């Protein structure tokens, strides 16, 4: 069988590209021929350059590389992988079957307008969706009436696992990618700022981007790190904060495999794939996210329970398990099997963590742990940071400083 994939240009550290090449390698291991057509953004000059980039960024893939979208030849299946590649696949006449490898609801990457609606239109081209996770399949079924297949969020257990020799710290790690709006870096940083004021001893680790940003509290920015270093980080920290406001990220599942409790947002996209036993979902206000993080930091027994439940949930969700699901989905398309979609139910059934963000003139002194930050230092920080929300948490701090 001969398969072609149409891919957007590479982004270093891109989990989406890593997932695509992992599944291309899955088909190669089953004897498929795979051609990969990659958007020409000027960074590569030849197919050989593309191969070297893949080896450097994602670990390598023995497919046949093509620079640009000039597709030629006949294929048993042609895959679109991003909204602007879907039209290329739709219009190509020499593919027996056409599929859509969907990892995100990409319309959400754009403000409402042309970009949003054109991305939505890509789901109307009659391509057969194979999605990562259940939420996207649910969305394709219910909103686009498109029979869809999915494979689960899995983790590489050779990389992500508990390490007993790593010393635990009272620390939070946050996937900080300000170049990706769906990662909500502003909300995440504001939530971490609240935690840092209330628990100044808690360490904050940022990772996932080499952009430093203008962050007013003490932290360590690790930049783009290897997946092995990610696992060490997850083993070192008390809780991980990973925000994805579109499709779920693979990162929370990798954190769970490593035994790290996870906090993410209580949004519809997270309710179909994330278990309420291993993940805590918070309302999208910074105060609510901060409260969810503090609940785990302040209660070791809760952290231990989440860690155990997360590891148990990921126990059988190895990469090989996901590959087998993906391979069966491709095989169904090749043999023209009818895709019958049963209703997909939510698996996260706990309520969201919601903090009170209403400004009040009077706050009980015992509402939050008394601060240990020196008065002068905290006052200076508050004066110079004009972007802080005067929320209940920060008003509490201010009242404590004034002695109210």
Feature-to-residue mapping (PLM):
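Short hydrophobic beta-strand element within catalytic cores of glycosyltransferases
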Residues: 261-265
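Acidic donor-binding loop of glycosyltransferase active sites
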Residues: 235-247, 260
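Membrane-proximal helix-turn-helix segments that form the acceptor-binding/catalytic region
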Residues: 67-70, 112-129
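A short, active-site helix/loop in glycosyltransferases that binds the activated sugar's phosphate group
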Residues: 88-89, 109, 125-147
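Conserved acidic donor-binding segment of nucleotide-sugar-dependent glycosyltransferases
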Residues: 278-286, 295-300
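A charged, aromatic-enriched C-terminal amphipathic alpha-helix characteristic of glycosyltransferases
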Residues: 298-358
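Short acidic alpha-helix that forms the nucleotide-activated donor recognition element
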Residues: 70-73, 226-237, 257
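Conserved catalytic-core segment of nucleotide-activated headgroup transferases in glycan assembly
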Residues: 19, 139-220, 224-227
């Amino acid at each position: 069988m001969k398969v072609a994939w149409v891919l957007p240009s590479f982004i270093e550290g891109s989990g989406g590209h890593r997932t695509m090449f992992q599944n291309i390698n899955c088909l190669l291991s089953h004897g498929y021929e795979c051609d990969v057509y990659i958007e020409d953004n000027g960074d590569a000059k030849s197919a050989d350059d593309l191969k070297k980039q893949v080896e450097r960024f994602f670990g390598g893939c023995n497919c046949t590389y093509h620079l640009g979208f000039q597709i030629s030849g006949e294929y048993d299946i042609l895959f679109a992988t991003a909204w602007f590649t879907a039209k290329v696949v739709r219009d190509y006449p020499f593919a027996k079957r056409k599929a859509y490898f969907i990892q995100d609801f990409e319309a959400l990457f754009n403000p409402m307008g042309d970009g949003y609606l054109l991305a939505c239109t890509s789901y109307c081209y009659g391509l057969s969706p194979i999605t990562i996770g259940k939420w996207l399949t649910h969305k394709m079924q219910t909103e686009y009436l498109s029979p869809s297949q999915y494979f689960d969020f899995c983790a590489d257990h050779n990389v992500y696992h508990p390490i007993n020799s790593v010393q635990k710290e009272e620390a939070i790690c946050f996937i900080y990618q300000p170049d990706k709006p769906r990662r909500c870096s502003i909300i995440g940083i504001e939530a971490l700022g609240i935690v840092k004021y209330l628990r100044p001893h808690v360490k904050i680790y940022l990772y996932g981007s080499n952009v430093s940003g203008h962050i007013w509290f003490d932290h360590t920015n690790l930049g783009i790190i290897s997946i092995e270093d990610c696992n060490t980080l997850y083993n070192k920290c008390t809780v991980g904060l990973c925000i994805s406001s579109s499709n779920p990220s693979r990162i929370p599942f990798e954190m769970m495999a490593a035994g790290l409790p996870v906090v993410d947002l209580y949004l519809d996209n997270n309710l179909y794939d994330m278990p309420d036993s291993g993940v805590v979902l918070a309302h999208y206000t910074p105060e609510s996210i901060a409260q969810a993080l503090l609940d785990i930091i302040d209660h070791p027994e809760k952290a231990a329970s989440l860690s155990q439940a997360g590891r148990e949930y990921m126990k059988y969700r190895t990469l090989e398990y996901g590959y087998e699901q993906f391979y069966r989905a491709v095989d169904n398309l090749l043999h023209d099997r009818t895709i019958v979609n049963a209703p997909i139910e939510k698996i996260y059934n706990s309520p969201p963590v919601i903090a009170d963000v209403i400004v009040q003139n009077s706050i009980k002194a015992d509402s939050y742990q008394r601060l240990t930050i020196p008065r002068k230092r905290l006052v200076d920080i508050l004066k110079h940071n004009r972007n802080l929300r005067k929320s209940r948490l920060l008003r509490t701090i201010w009242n404590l400083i004034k002695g109210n």
